């Protein structure tokens, strides 16, 4: 049977889609590049914002209208965070979360045999293992994205991801080396290391992100190593010194800011204040004078005043980011911020002002 994938959200989802494609191909399925050729449609979802949920449901309804006899599989962060909502989506024949994705071929076989809807979302525990999906190619990409970390322990007040991904866990260095070698053997010269909270890589064995980059850079054939999105507080002096010693390391840092206002950062339950964030950026630029630092910037968080917004915007301007991803606050059921007062009005005007400046 032919399978077609829709991938929403971050680069971790891109990695996991490639892994699921590899799993299905090993089980005898064919992954196709055109939806018209598919018998099975798989939707790897993101649930960071409500608009992401809406795009997902719209895509599933459209596919069901155009392919009424196809099988539709919903997987990823949305069903993991909201399993009952996901199971109630009428278009979904199989619902699978972010845990135990290796079960996918068996669940599909069961679905094809019994023709009965399946909901198979397993809950995370306190100490889950890292699930590495087999993958040594990235269709339609000239660089390889390698997931080395999963989960988050931070519980920012607005964020659903700890509930969708479980606690922090890491790909062991030897498995990382083997995965990077597989990509290199298939001609990939650049590898992007990805994770949900990438800076926490190796915390289980007192390791570090620098260790991961060193392991990857030591693989024959790997010429460039990049990092995915980072939380700022774990980039220590020692780690930056080790990264600066690696000629393969590409100094591009995406450091999530969210707000430059300390009052808002406290309400968000972020683990730094604006002065600490600025010091981290200064430290990075000391080791990498020509680096690019990019960031995420949230507007309209509950309780944000005009003065808070002006402080936040002024701080972002002082940081001289190479680029900013600006987005509106989106309430997520189950988070602490969802119970806060309503977000401020005219958020879209503030986002426009930020982008214009």
What are these regions (language model features)?
Residues 47-48, 165-166, 266-272, 339-344:
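Short glycine-enriched, charge-decorated loop/helix-capping segments at active-site entrances
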Residues 1-200, 238, 243, 249, ...:
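Proteins enriched for Cys/Gly/acidic motifs involved in redox and nucleic-acid/cofactor modification
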Residues 10, 201-217, 221, 268, ...:
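Radical SAM enzyme [4Fe-4S]-AdoMet core and its adjacent flexible, acidic
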Residues 73-74, 81, 185-306:
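Conserved SAM/AdoMet-binding glycine-rich loop
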Residues 50, 170, 203, 271, ...:
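Charge-dense, low-complexity intrinsically disordered segments
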Residues 97, 123, 231, 305, ...:
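Alpha-helix initiation/capping motif
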């Amino acid at each position: 049977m032919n399978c077609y994938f829709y991938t929403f959200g971050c680069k971790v989802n891109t990695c996991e889609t490639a892994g699921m494609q590899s799993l299905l191909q090993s089980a005898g399925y064919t992954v196709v590049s055109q939806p018209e050729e598919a018998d099975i449609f798989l939707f790897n979802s993101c649930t960071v914002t409500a608009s992401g949920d809406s795009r997902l449901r719209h895509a599933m309804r459209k596919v069901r209208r155009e392919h009424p006899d196809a099988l539709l599989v919903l997987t990823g962060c949305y069903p993991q965070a909201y399993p009952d909502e996901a199971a109630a989506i009428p278009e979904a024949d199989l619902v699978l979360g972010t845990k135990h994705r290796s079960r996918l071929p068996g669940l599909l076989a069961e679905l094809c045999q019994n023709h009965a809807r399946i909901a198979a979302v397993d809950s995370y525990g306190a100490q889950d293992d890292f699930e590495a999906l087999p993958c040594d190619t990235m269709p339609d990409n000239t660089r390889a994205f390698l997931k080395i970390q999963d989960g988050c322990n931070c519980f920012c007040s607005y964020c659903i991801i700890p509930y969708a991904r479980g606690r922090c866990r890491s790909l062991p260095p030897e498995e990382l080396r083997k995965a990077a070698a597989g990509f290199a053997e298939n001609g990939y010269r650049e590898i992007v290391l990805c994770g949900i909270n990438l800076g926490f890589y190796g915390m289980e064995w007192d390791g570090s992100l620098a260790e991961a980059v060193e392991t990857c850079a030591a693989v024959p054939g790997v010429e460039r190593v990049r990092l995915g999105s980072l939380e700022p507080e774990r980039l220590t002096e020692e780690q930056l010194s080790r990264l600066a010693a690696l000629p393969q390391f590409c100094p591009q840092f995406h450091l999530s800011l969210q707000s430059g206002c300390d009052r808002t950062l406290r309400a968000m339950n972020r683990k730094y204040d604006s002065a600490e964030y600025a010091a981290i950026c200064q430290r990075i630029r000391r080791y990498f004078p020509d680096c690019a630092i990019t960031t995420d910037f949230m507007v309209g968080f509950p309780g944000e005043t005009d003065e808070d917004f002006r402080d936040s915007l002024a701080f972002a301007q002082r940081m001289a980011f190479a680029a900013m991803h600006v987005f509106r606050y989106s309430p997520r059921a189950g988070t602490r911020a969802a119970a806060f007062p309503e977000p401020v009005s005219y958020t879209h005007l503030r986002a426009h002002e930020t982008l214009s400046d």
